[in-house]
Amino acid sequence: MPLLRAEWWEAHQPLVVFMWIILLVVPFAIVYGAGDTFETVLECIVNDYLTFIVLLFGLFCVSGNITVGGDFAGSPRVNACLLALGTLLSSCIGTTGASMLMVRPVIKMNSWRKRKRHIMVFFIFLISNMGGCLTPIGDPPLLMGFMRGVPFFWSMHLLPILIFNLVILLFVFYHLDKKAYRKDIAQGRKPDISRPGTEFYIEGLHNIIFLIMIVGAVILSGVLPGMSAFQDAAGNVRGIRLYGEVTLTLPALIEIVIILLAAFLSFKTTDSSIRTKNHFTWGAIKEVAVLFIGIFITMQPALMLLKSVGPNLGISEPYQMFWATGALSSFLDNTPTYLVFLTTAGTLGLTGGITTALGQIPVNLLEAISCGAVFMGANTYIGNAPNFMVKAISDENGVNMPSFFGYILWSLAFLVPVFILDMLVFFL
């Protein structure tokens, strides 16, 4: 709908999302009963959506209070360096954090250009997705793996695969951008640089403290549940029971409070002129909040089906895990998809590899599942949370981004061939 009638969608977005939720909830309630349906929806909102949107909100606020300026213009060389930097940064502060921190500077440096949609598409490929594969901080699926016994630094095993993909995609990007850059120059477009040179400055740099607070909150959410102080006598994580078995856990509550505090302090300590320079508005986060609550709720039946049949799918080889996890992560939330196939791998009864709470998982299977979940979230706008956020901010700032299906064509053209190479080189 937002692709067919954008103005109508903006005016009626909450109503449309609510309609789709009702279309799912009513049949679900008829089959399973109102009580179970309410519990399922509430559990989805409390345990998945709430921490998800609070994290996005916090990163959106803090990154919006940091602005980068100077004499750098969006040339192919500068853009390639920015993408490489952002890709590596994603594993340090998360794909969402890196995306929100880098998206406005990249857009600003390329504001003089006409042909720039490819820049933001590759931004999503690399910074919003692939770059998050090296640590549990990078992407939520890896954080879930860490919470279930995968060592914190194990995901550094994925560095050769990341470098392999990064080199290929940056090579392709550089030549695409070089061609577009020459066309822009030929049409008389020039970067808006007042003085030649390499002057560079960052305003609102103190917000890095609040960014670190948010990253720390995410790490705590993975560490605290394993501590005895946060467990009851039965070994369950302590929390506030809301309805039935639905509980807002204390670690999740602590994470939410820290993130909201970081966002509040960021706004209180940063001059509003910085947000003005960033063309900061609430439009992008509002759209993501409304759209993703619909996605989270309406994907529950598919995830329930996947959980019930996952161990019986006959998937046991690394290349099968890579494609199965990746294909479903493209359209469902990659975190539960990762957990389903991680559980499947743990039930195969294989020996050797990593000892987790789900069983022994061979390294090659764990690599395939991790790469499938993290890398293939880039296949669609809804595959990973930062994707749609980057699209929304880009649209707000005058970048003509591809439509939903148009973006899929980009991923089919540039990502799928890389994934085929990944399979041939690493997973066969």
What are these regions (language model features)?
Residues M1, W20-V31, L56-G64, I163-H175, ...:
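Hydrophobic core segments of alpha-helical transmembrane domains in multi-pass membrane transport
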Residues E43-L55, W154-V172, R241-L260, W323-S329, ...:
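Alpha-helical transmembrane segments
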Residues R115, L134-T135, F153-I202, F375-L428:
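Juxtamembrane and boundary regions of transmembrane helices in multi-pass small-molecule transporters
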Residues L3-E7, V25-D48, F57-G74, L88-L101, ...:
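Transmembrane alpha-helix boundary signature
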Residues M213-L348:
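Transmembrane helical segments that form the transport core of multi-pass membrane transport proteins
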Residues S155-T269, V425:
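Core mid-bundle transmembrane helix pairs that form the ion/substrate translocation pathway
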Residues P27-A29, S90, L101-K114, I119-V121, ...:
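Membrane-interfacial helix-loop connectors
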Residues W8-V17, F38-L50, F152-I161, G197-I202, ...:
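Interfacial loop-to-helix junctions that mark the boundaries of transmembrane helices
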